[in-house]
Amino acid sequence: VVIVILAIALTAVTQMIGQNTISGAYTYDETKAIELAQSYLGEIKAKRYDENSPVGGVPPCDGVSGGNGCTANSNAALGPDTGELARTAFDDVDDYDDLDEGSGSGNALLDAEGNTRTGYENFRVQVQVTYSGNVAPRSGSVSDSKKVVLTITQPNGEALDFTFHRANY
């Protein structure tokens, strides 16, 4: 009788440990994904709103040609500017549009200085930038805000989305 009770107890403990090991691995990957997202978001948030925005964002580009006008007011115009092929050359938020690095992308996962990231094997980073419309009260211009969606795909295939808006200020 004691052997049967002991066998049942050991089976239950073994299953519990197995489940904790599996969930612990997922938690570890999620933590690494969040660290990776924080790194990319910090890098992107530090950039200017637009190619024609001054460093610091004041005064904002105003969407008119010449002077301090924004470069374009359409989603088709977003993405790296001419000559900005490497992330180290990106100088405004929309340069990151369509960035795709890491596992399955064909591009290495890099840090802000262009060095290959270690410890993030099988992670993938994708960035989409779009105009988010008039979310700022100063005008009806489509160029008031850009929406940045950062997607981190973990080794298990689960994707985490991180979103922020960059205002034209």
Label for each model-derived stretch:
Residues 1-38:
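Aliphatic-rich helix starts adjacent to a transmembrane/signal segment
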Residues 34-169:
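Low-complexity, Gly/Pro-rich coil/beta segments used as flexible assembly/activation regions
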